[in-house]
């Protein structure tokens, strides 16, 4: 791993020395390529404009070093460690190996009965055009979290823009953990606006969608609800410890009392989560996204998703689909 990191630093230094003062333009083009705003051909063309004819190989060496390091990190983090055979002798140490008598082989030779065959005859033909046509999709398109290699490549681009040499593995792990916690907070804020929940210790949310709400006009409703949701405070003389587990009979009794003291009308079924719910959750709970720049950018994206076509546009789209269907019918 250290060897690949040193190779990346050497390739970055050679590239910086070859480009000179225009290295910021190169980092900007690299960032645009990672965001898929420009193609690989356009990125190579811009890199050739910044480099001399003799230094074009430096650009290729730098890209190869980045891809190699990302691939090595993904393979080491995801693949379990396998036991490797050392290739040594199976004899016990300290005991000299006894010589075994070699008997002459009695296997008949059937080499003359077989014809030589090319082992590469059954290998499928690789088409480079198919690989070029397969575009790399972003996380917004695949609706999946970025892999460790993708996140490290993106962090390395940001590090190069800030005049940093490399990115540590601990920083990538910390970023992955922060991303998961951030998404968990957004989902918690979204679900808490739609479903009832309970609080433990005044801040921990749990039991989403239990649909057990206290009846405000019933005397035993609030004590039963708070006894099931709050934990007793720790004593000053005793250290704080985990709360004792409730026996099944007592838990069943508390649940029956809470259900008897709750409202008798069931909540109507909710519609699936939409962009309107996300907009309301972010507007009400601003603490989920404390950065103002990120909050403004995401609010703009959400408001842009709320656009819907008018009746005229729907009618024109229907006419266009009819023309396409008619043309396909005539062609076939």
From Swiss-Prot:
Transmembrane segments: none
Protein origin, superkingdom: Eukaryota
Compartment annotation: Nucleus
Biased composition, class Basic residues, residue ranges: 95-104
Gene Ontology molecular function, alphabetical: transcription coactivator activity
CDD domains to which the protein is assigned, alphabetical: HFD_TADA1 (cd22934)
GO biological process: regulation of transcription by RNA polymerase II
Main location: nucleus
Keywords: Nucleus, Transcription, Transcription regulation
Function: Probably involved in transcriptional regulation.
Family in the record: Belongs to the TADA1 family.
Name by which UniProt lists this protein: Transcriptional adapter 1
Organism: Danio rerio
């Amino acid at each position: 791993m250290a060897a690949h990191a040193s190779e990346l630093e050497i390739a970055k230094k050679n590239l910086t020395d070859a480009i000179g003062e225009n290295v910021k333009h190169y980092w900007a083009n690299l960032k645009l390529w990672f965001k898929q705003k420009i193609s690989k051909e356009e990125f190579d063309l811009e890199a050739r404009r910044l480099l001399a004819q003799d230094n074009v190989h430096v650009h290729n060496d730098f890209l190869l070093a980045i891809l190699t390091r990302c691939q090595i990190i993904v393979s080491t983090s995801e693949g379990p460690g396998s036991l490797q055979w050392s290739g040594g002798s199976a004899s016990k140490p300290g005991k000299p190996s006894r010589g075994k008598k070699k008997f002459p082989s009695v296997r008949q030779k059937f080499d003359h009965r077989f014809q030589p065959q090319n082992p590469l005859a059954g290998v499928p033909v690789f088409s480079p055009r198919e690989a070029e046509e397969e575009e790399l999709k972003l996380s917004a398109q695949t609706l999946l979290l970025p892999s460790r290699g993708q996140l490290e490549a993106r962090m390395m681009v940001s590090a190069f823009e800030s005049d940093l040499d490399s990115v540590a593995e601990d920083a990538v792990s910390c970023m992955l953990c922060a991303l998961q916690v951030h998404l968990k907070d957004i989902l918690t804020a979204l679900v808490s606006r739609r479903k009832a929940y309970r609080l433990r210790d005044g801040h921990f949310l749990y039991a989403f969608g239990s649909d057990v709400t206290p009846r405000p006009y019933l005397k035993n409703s609030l004590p039963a609800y708070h006894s099931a949701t709050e934990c007793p405070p720790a004593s000053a003389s005793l250290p704080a410890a985990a709360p004792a587990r409730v026996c099944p009979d007592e838990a069943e009794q508390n649940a029956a009392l809470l259900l008897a003291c709750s409202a008798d009308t069931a909540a109507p079924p909710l519609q699936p989560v939409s962009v309107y719910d996300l907009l309301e959750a972010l507007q009400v709970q601003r603490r989920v996204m404390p950065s103002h720049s990120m909050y403004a950018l995401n609010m703009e994206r959400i408001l842009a998703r709320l656009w819907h076509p008018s009746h005229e546009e729907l009618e024109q789209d229907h006419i266009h689909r009819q023309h396409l269907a008619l043309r396909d019918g005539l062609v076939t």
